[in-house]
C-alpha cells in the first residue's frame, strides 16, 4: 500500500445549503436573510397598512433584504472566514502602524531560562531540535525518519509550535571548530585565518529547528483538558511568577522533552537564545547575528528586548499620487518592520510576508516525496525563508463525535443541496475523507488526531527581493506536491504573530488555517530533516550543494578514529576532476594539525613533492634514484624483519616456499640467528652465504659437515640474490650503504615508484601468467608490498600521533595480492592504531575488488566520464538508483558551455593561455559520504593560498585549476 502525507482539509467545514425556499438549494447565509427579511418585510407592511407607511416599509425592507442576501452570498464557502477577510480588508484600506508597545499580539515576551512568558499569560518552554539525515537515503531509512516524527507528534502537548529557521552559519564558530584541539599549531592557525575570507564569500547557511511547548496548562497543553487545568489553577490562586510555578514549568518541560524521541536531541534554549529568536523573526532577512552560545541560567525582561513597528503595506514609502488620491493606501501585500524605541539601530528595516498553507491534494502526497518544506532550502533569492507548524492534539472521543456531526451534515446536504455547484461530487469527496480519517483513528488506538497549521515566513531587505522570492516560493510549492499557499493583503501583521509563541490561535488567525490530520499522516511531511554533512570539527573540505544553503562541510580524520569509526577515505573519479587536488588539501591540513604522512606516488611526475615542497621535515625517495634503501631487514623492527623479508623476497626470487633452501633461510632469519650472525641487511645475508661456500681453487676446505650442507642448501638462494642484485631497480634492496629514512622522525615521506611496474590481479592469480612476469614486475610486487607494510608498522607502533597513509593512483598496488592484503588489514585495524588511509583511484569498483572496501565508509567521488562506471560506483556508495535516477547530476561529467561553443567564437577569448580545465560545469564538485553514512553533493573548497593552489594543480600549461 502506498504511503502518503495527507491533510483532511475541510472535512468539518462543509458549506450548508437549504432548499426551504421554493425547493431551491441556497446557502444558509443566503436563505436565512432572504426568508427572514421577506417575511419580516411583508409582516411589517401588513401591520402598518393603516399608517400610510406600508409602501415605504415594503421598499426599504426589500432593499435591506436584498442587501443582506447579497452580503450572505459573499460569505466565503471555506476558511478563512468572513471575519478574517474583513479584518484584512480593513487593515488594507485603513492601515495603521502597530508596535510592540500597543498591540498585544506583537508584544515582547519575558524570558527566564528556556521559558517564554507571553503577554497574555501563556508560558512556553523552548528547545532546539536536531534535524534527521534524510537526503538521498533509502526508502527504508526515510520511513524510519517519518516514524520518529509520528512519535513526536503524539507526544507534543496541544498548541505546540515547530519552527524551521533559515540562519547564517556562525563563521567565527566555524573557525573555532577548525582550530579546536590544535591552537598550538601556528601554521594551522594561519591556514584557518586564510579560510575566513572564503567563508565570508560563501555565506554558508543552515536550518535551525526550534520547538515551543506550552507548560502553563498541564501535560495536555492548550486544549479542552488543558483549559480545565488552567481553570483549576485559577481557582486555587496559583501565582504564575512564583518560584514554585517556575519549578513546575521547568519540571513539566523536562518531562515533555524526555518523552520525545532521543534522535531529535531536544536541548533547552537559554534566555539569550530566546531573545535572539525574537529579533530573528522580527527583523527577518536583515538581522544576521548568529545564535548565541549556551550559557547557564539568566533572564531577560520584555523592556530589555528591542521593540518593533509594523507598517502594513509600507505606507511610509507609498507612491506619490495626485493630491486628490494621495490619501489612498499603498496596497502592498507585505509589512515593513522597523525598530523603534531605544534599540532603533538593532537592524535595518525588514520587508516581510507570511503565507499560510490553505490546501493540499485531496488524496495526499505520495511518500517519499511529500517533504514540501525542504523546498525552502532550494531557494536562493536573497531572502530568508522560515516556517512554522502549529500542532494541536485533540481528544480522540471528541474528534469522533466531531466527525459524526460532519457526516450527519453531509447526509443532510444530499437532500438539501443536490448537485448545485458540483455538490454531489464535493459531498462524496468529503464523505470519503471523513471515512478515511475515521478509519485511521480506529485502526490504531495510539493514533493521535491533530490539527496542523503551516505558515511560511519570508523576509528580505527590500520589496523587490521579497516579491521575487514569493513568486519563486509559489513555484516551488507547486512543484513539491501541489501545495497551495495564499498571500493575503492586509493580514501579514496579524499572521506574523504566529511566530510570536503564546498568542491565542483565534487572535493570530492560526485556527483559520488548521487542517485535520493524524500524527502518522502529518509525520510523512517530515519537516525536521537535515542535509548536513561532515564533522563538527576539522578542516574545511567544501560546501554542501544538496540545497541552496551552501553549508560548510568539515572533515576530521583523526577525530573519526577517536569516535571509534574508521579513519579511511576513498577518493575516486575520472582524471582531471580534482581527486589529487582534494587529497593534497586533506594531507596538508592533517600535517598542519600535527599528523605524519606516508605517500606512495607511482609516477615520475612528482606532483606530491611539488605540492608539499614547503614542508621542511620530509624525505622524497625516488626508488630509481638510489637515495634511500628499502631493505626489509633494515627498515622493519628486529622481531619481524626476517619474516617480512621472507614474505616479499621469496616470491620475487622465484623460490619454492616448501624447498629446503627456503627452510634453511627461514632458520637463519630468526631474530636470534640474525643477531648472532650479524645479518642486518640483505647484502650481509649474501656475504654470509657466500662466505660459507666451498673455497675456490685448491684451497683446503676446513668447513664442518654441517656448514658444508648448509652452504649447499643455500646455494640456490645465493645465486638468485646475486642475479637480482645486478638490476638498477633493485638497488634499494641490495645496497646496504644507502641510508634508511627515520620514518618516525619525519613529518612526510614520499616514495616515488614510477620506475616500478606492478602486475594486475589476473597476472598474479593465474599461474601461467605469473610465471611470465618480468623481473621488474616481481621486484615491484616486493617493493610496493614492503612500502605499505612499512607504513602500517611505523604508524601502528605510534598511537600518540595520527599517521596518514596515502596511496596515489592506487590501482596497481591494490591489484597485487600483497598490497591488497596489507591495505585491507589497515582498513580493519587503523582505528585502534590511530592511523588513517587515503586511497586515490580512478576505478574503485575494479581497484578495490581484491582488497575489499566493506570497512571503509568515507568516500569523496568526483565525476566519471563513463556512465557504466558511474552507475556502479553510485550503487556501491549506497545511492538507490531506482529512487534517484538523477544520479548523473552527481556522478557524470558535464561539459560547460564555454567548452562546447562554436569554433568561430574564438575571438571572444581573453588574451593569453586558456583557463579552461576541461572538466566542465562540475569542476570542483564531488559526492561525499561521511563517517555517519550521510550522502550529498559538495563543492570542494578552493585552496585560499594562491601559491599552494597552483602547486596542487596538475593541469598542463595552466595557472589555475
Q: What are the residue ranges of the model-derived segments?
A:
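Phosphate-binding P-loop/Walker A region and its immediate neighborhood
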Residues: 281-323, 328-332, 341-349, 479-568, ...
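Glycine-rich phosphate-binding loop of nucleotide-binding enzymes
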Residues: 16-42, 132, 139-141, 146-154, ...
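Extended, folded cores of ATP/NTP-driven motor/assembly subunits in large transport
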Residues: 62-70, 92-510
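P-loop NTPase motor core of the ASCE superfamily
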Residues: 643-684, 847-961
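Switch/coupling segment of Walker-type NTPase motor domains
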Residues: 133, 139, 159-182, 190, ...
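Conserved P-loop NTPase motor cores
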Residues: 28, 414-415, 551, 557-577, ...
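Short, charged cytosolic
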Residues: 1-15
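P-loop NTPase motor domains
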Residues: 139-157, 377, 496-552, 602, ...
Amino acid at each position: 500500500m502506498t504511503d502518503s502525507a495527507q491533510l483532511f482539509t475541510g472535512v468539518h467545514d462543509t458549506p450548508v445549503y437549504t432548499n426551504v425556499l421554493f425547493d431551491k438549494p441556497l446557502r444558509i447565509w443566503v436563505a436565512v436573510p432572504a426568508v427572514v427579511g421577506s417575511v419580516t418585510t411583508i409582516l411589517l407592511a401588513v401591520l402598518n397598512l393603516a399608517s400610510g407607511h406600508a409602501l415605504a416599509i415594503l421598499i426599504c425592507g426589500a432593499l435591506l433584504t436584498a442587501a443582506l442576501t447579497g452580503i450572505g452570498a459573499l460569505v466565503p464557502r471555506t476558511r478563512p472566514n468572513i471575519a478574517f477577510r474583513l479584518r484584512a480588508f480593513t487593515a488594507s484600506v485603513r492601515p495603521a502602524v502597530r508596535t510592540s508597545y500597543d498591540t498585544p499580539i506583537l508584544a515582547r515576551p519575558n524570558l527566564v531560562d528556556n521559558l517564554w512568558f507571553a503577554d497574555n499569560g501563556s508560558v512556553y518552554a523552548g528547545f532546539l531540535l536536531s534535524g534527521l539525515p534524510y537526503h538521498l537515503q533509502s526508502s527504508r531509512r526515510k520511513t524510519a525518519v517519518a516514524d520518529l516524527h509520528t512519535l513526536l507528534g503524539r507526544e507534543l502537548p496541544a498548541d505546540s509550535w515547530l519552527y524551521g529557521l533559515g540562519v547564517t552559519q556562525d563563521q567565527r564558530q566555524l573557525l573555532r571548530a577548525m582550530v579546536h584541539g590544535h591552537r598550538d599549531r601556528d601554521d594551522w592557525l594561519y591556514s584557518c585565518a586564510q579560510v575566513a575570507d572564503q567563508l565570508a564569500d560563501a555565506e554558508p547557511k543552515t536550518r535551525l529547528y526550534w520547538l515551543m511547548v506550552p507548560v502553563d496548562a498541564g501535560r495536555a497543553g492548550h486544549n479542552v483538558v488543558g483549559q480545565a487545568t488552567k481553570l483549576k489553577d485559577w481557582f486555587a490562586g496559583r501565582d504564575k511568577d512564583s518560584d514554585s510555578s517556575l519549578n513546575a514549568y521547568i519540571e513539566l518541560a523536562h518531562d515533555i522533552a524526555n518523552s520525545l524521541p532521543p534522535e531529535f536531541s531536544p536541548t533547552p534554549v537559554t534566555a539569550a537564545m530566546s531573545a535572539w529568536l525574537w529579533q530573528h523573526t522580527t527583523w527577518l532577512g536583515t538581522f544576521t547575528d548568529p545564535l548565541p552560545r549556551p550559557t547557564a541560567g539568566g533572564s531577560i525582561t520584555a523592556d530589555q528586548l528591542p521593540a518593533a513597528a509594523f507598517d502594513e503595506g509600507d505606507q511610509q514609502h507609498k507612491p506619490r499620487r495626485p493630491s486628490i488620491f494621495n490619501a489612498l493606501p499603498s496596497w502592498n501585500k507585505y509589512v515593513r518592520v522597523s525598530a523603534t524605541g531605544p534599540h532603533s539601530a538593532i537592524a535595518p528595516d525588514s520587508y516581510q510576508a507570511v503565507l499560510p498553507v490553505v490546501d493540499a491534494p485531496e488524496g495526499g502526497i505520495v511518500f517519499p516525496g511529500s517533504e514540501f518544506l525542504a523546498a525552502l532550502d532550494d531557494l536562493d533569492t536573497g531572502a530568508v525563508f522560515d516556517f512554522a507548524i502549529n500542532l494541536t492534539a485533540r481528544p480522540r472521543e471528541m474528534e469522533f463525535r466531531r466527525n459524526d456531526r460532519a457526516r450527519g451534515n453531509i447526509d443532510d446536504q444530499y437532500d438539501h443541496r443536490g448537485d448545485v455547484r458540483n455538490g454531489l461530487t464535493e459531498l462524496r469527496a468529503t464523505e470519503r475523507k471523513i471515512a478515511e480519517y475515521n478509519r485511521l483513528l480506529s485502526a490504531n488506538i495510539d493514533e493521535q488526531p491533530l490539527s496542523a497549521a503551516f505558515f511560511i515566513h519570508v523576509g528580505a531587505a527590500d520589496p523587490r527581493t521579497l516579491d521575487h522570492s514569493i513568486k519563486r516560493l509559489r513555484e516551488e510549492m507547486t512543484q513539491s506536491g501541489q501545495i497551495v499557499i495564499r498571500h493575503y493583503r492586509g493580514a501579514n501583521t496579524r499572521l506574523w504573530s504566529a511566530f510570536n509563541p503564546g498568542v491565542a490561535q483565534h487572535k493570530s488567525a492560526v485556527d483559520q488555517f488548521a487542517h485535520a490530520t493524524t500524527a502518522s499522516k502529518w509525520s510523512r511531511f517530515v519537516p525536521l530533516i537535515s542535509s548536513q554533512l561532515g564533522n563538527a570539527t576539522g578542516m574545511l573540505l567544501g560546501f554542501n550543494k544538496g540545497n541552496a544553503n551552501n553549508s560548510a562541510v568539515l572533515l576530521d580524520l583523526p577525530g573519526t578514529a577517536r569516535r571509534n569509526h574508521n579513519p579511511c577515505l576513498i577518493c575516486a573519479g575520472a582524471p582531471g576532476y580534482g581527486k589529487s587536488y582534494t587529497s593534497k588539501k586533506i594531507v596538508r591540513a592533517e600535517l598542519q594539525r600535527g599528523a605524519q604522512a606516508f605517500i606512495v606516488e607511482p609516477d615520475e611526475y612528482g606532483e606530491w613533492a611539488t605540492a608539499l615542497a614547503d614542508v621542511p621535515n620530509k624525505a622524497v625517495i625516488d626508488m630509481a634514484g638510489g637515495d634511500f634503501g628499502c631493505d626489509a631487514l633494515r627498515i622493519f623492527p628486529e622481531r619481524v624483519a626476517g619474516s617480512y623479508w621472507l614474505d616479499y623476497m621469496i616470491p620475487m626470487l622465484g623460490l619454492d616456499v616448501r624447498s629446503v633452501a627456503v627452510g634453511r633461510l627461514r632458520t637463519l632469519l630468526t631474530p636470534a640467528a640474525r643477531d648472532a650472525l650479524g645479518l642486518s641487511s640483505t647484502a650481509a645475508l649474501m656475504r654470509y652465504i657466500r662466505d660459507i661456500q666451498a673455497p675456490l681453487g685448491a684451497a683446503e676446505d676446513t668447513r664442518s659437515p654441517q656448514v658444508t650442507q648448509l652452504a649447499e642448501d643455500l646455494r640456490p638462494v645465493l645465486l638468485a640474490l646475486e642475479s637480482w642484485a645486478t638490476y638498477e631497480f633493485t638497488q634499494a634492496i641490495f645496497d646496504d650503504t644507502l641510508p634508511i629514512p627515520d620514518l618516525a622522525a619525519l613529518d612526510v615521506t614520499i616514495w616515488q615508484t614510477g620506475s616500478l611496474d606492478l602486475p594486475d590481479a589476473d597476472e598474479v592469480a593465474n599461474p601461467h601468467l605469473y610465471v611470465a612476469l618480468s623481473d621488474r614486475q616481481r621486484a615491484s610486487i616486493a617493493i610496493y608490498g614492503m612500502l605499505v607494510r612499512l607504513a602500517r608498522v611505523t604508524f601502528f607502533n605510534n598511537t600518540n600521533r595520527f599517521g596518514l597513509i596515502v596511496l596515489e593512483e592506487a590501482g596497481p598496488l591494490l591489484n597485487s595480492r600483497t598490497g591488497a592484503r596489507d591495505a585491507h588489514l589497515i582498513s580493519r585495524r587503523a582505528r585502534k592504531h590511530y592511523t588513517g588511509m587515503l586511497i586515490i583511484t580512478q576505478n574503485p569498483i575494479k581497484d578495490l575488488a581484491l582488497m575489499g572496501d566493506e570497512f571503509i565508509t568515507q568516500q569523496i567521488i568526483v565525476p566519471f566520464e563513463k556512465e557504466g562506471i558511474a552507475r556502479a560506483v553510485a550503487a556501491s556508495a549506497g545511492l538507490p538508483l531506482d529512487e534517484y535516477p538523477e544520479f548523473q547530476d552527481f556522478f557524470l561529467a558535464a561539459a560547460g558551455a564555454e567548452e562546447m561553443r562554436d569554433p568561430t567564437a574564438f575571438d571572444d577569448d581573453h588574451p593569453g593561455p586558456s583557463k579552461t580545465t576541461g572538466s566542465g560545469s562540475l569542476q570542483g564538485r564531488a559526492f561525499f559520504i561521511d563517517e555517519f553514512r550521510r550522502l550529498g553533493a559538495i563543492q570542494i573548497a578552493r585552496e585560499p593560498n594562491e601559491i599552494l593552489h597552483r602547486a596542487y594543480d596538475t593541469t598542463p600549461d595552466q595557472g589555475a585549476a
